[in-house]
Amino acid sequence: MSHPTTFNSHLWQQHRLAQQPIEISILLTQMGFAAKVLAREISRAALMGNLGLMGETNATGDAQKKLDVFSNQIVIDAFSNIGLVAVIASEELDQVKLIECGQQAQYILCTDPLDGSSNTDTGSAVGTIFGIYRRQTSGYCSTEADVLQPGTELVTAGYVLYGTSTMLVYTTGGRVDGFTLDPSLGEFLLSHENIRCPETGKTYSANLSYYQEWHPHIQNFADYLSDRKSHTAHTLRYSGALVADVHRCLLEGGLYFYPPTADQPEGKLRLLYECAPLAFLVEQAGGKATSGLARIMDLEVTSIHQRSPLVIGSQVAVNLYQTFLEQGKAA
C-alpha cells in the first residue's frame, strides 16, 4: 500500500524537482495552515457563537458576517511575521494592509477569506480564494501600486472549499493539484492529481434571480441552456458560493457565469481576489475564463476592489456564451 502524499511533502518535491522557489512553498504552507484553522472554526461556528451579522458592511458594500471578520484575521495572522509578505489585499479591508517592509518581503497576497459567507448560517459550502504576486516596486516598503497587477503576473493561486470535506486546490502554473484534509491526521493529502477541466459539460451555475436584469442576449443564452425540450438542456447547479460552483465546473465541466446587470454594469465579483485567481487556476487546468468581452487574466486592475463580470469553466461552454454575446452585438 502506497503512502499518501501530504501537501507539505508535495511542495517540497515541487521545490526540489521543478525548481519552485522555496518562498512559494513557504507561502503555500501557510495557506494550508490557515485553511486548517478555518475548517475547524467554520465547522464549530454555531457552537462558538460566531454565526450571524456584525452589523457592518465591508469595503464593497456587502453585509459582514462574524465569520467574515474572524476568517480575515486568521489569514492575516498566518502570513504575518514570516518575512515574505509585504501587503495583503482582502475583501474585508478598505485598503491594503502593510505586513512587512524590507528586501525579503517580496510577495503580495490577495484574498477573499470567506467566499459565500451568506451560506454559513445554514451550514452550506463556503470557500477561501487566494492569489499571490511578486512586488513590482523597489522601495523599502510596498505600496498599493504593487497590488494593482493583472492576473498574468500571478505566481500562484488557488482556493479552499469547506463542504462535505475540506479541499485545497492550487496552481503555480502548468498544472493544478487538489488535496483533501484528513481530520484524523490534520494533514492535506493529495487526492486529485493534475486536474484537467473537461472541454464541455452539462451543468451551469448562475443566479437566475437576476434574469430580468440581464441583457437580452444573455437571457437567450440562459434560455438555451434550460430548454428541456432540446438536446442542449443543461442542469442548473447554483450554491451561492463562487468556490463551490467553480469547483464543480473544474471537475465535471460546464460553466459559471455572473454577468453585468443594469444596477451593476461592471459586474459584481471582484477582479483582484476572486476572478483573477480562479481564472489563472482554471486556465492551467485547460478551461477558460472571460469577462464576456476579454480574457480575465488580461484585464487592467485600477483599484483593489474593482469589479468584473465572470464567465468561467469548460472551453466549449465559455465559447458558446461568447457566441451569444456576439450575436447580441450584431443584432
Curated annotation (Swiss-Prot):
It is found in: Cytoplasm. GO terms for biological process: fructose 1,6-bisphosphate metabolic process; fructose 6-phosphate metabolic process; fructose metabolic process; gluconeogenesis; reductive pentose-phosphate cycle; sucrose biosynthetic process. Substrate binds at residues 115-118, 207, 238, 268. It catalyses: beta-D-fructose 1,6-bisphosphate + H2O = beta-D-fructose 6-phosphate + phosphate. GO terms for molecular function: fructose 1,6-bisphosphate 1-phosphatase activity; magnesium ion binding. The keyword Hydrolase applies. Mg(2+) 1 binds at residues 91, 112, 114. InterPro entries: FBPase_C_dom, FBPase_class-1, FBPase_N, FBPtase, Fructose_bisphosphatase_AS. Mg(2+) 2 binds at residues 112, 115, 274. The keyword DNA damage does not apply. GO terms for cellular component: cytosol. Keywords: Calvin cycle, Carbohydrate metabolism, Cytoplasm, Hydrolase, Magnesium, Metal-binding. Transmembrane segments: none annotated. Its EC number is 3.1.3.11. Pathway: Carbohydrate biosynthesis; Calvin cycle. HAMAP family: FBPase_class1. This is Fructose-1,6-bisphosphatase class 1 2. It comes from Acaryochloris marina (strain MBIC 11017). The gene is fbp2.
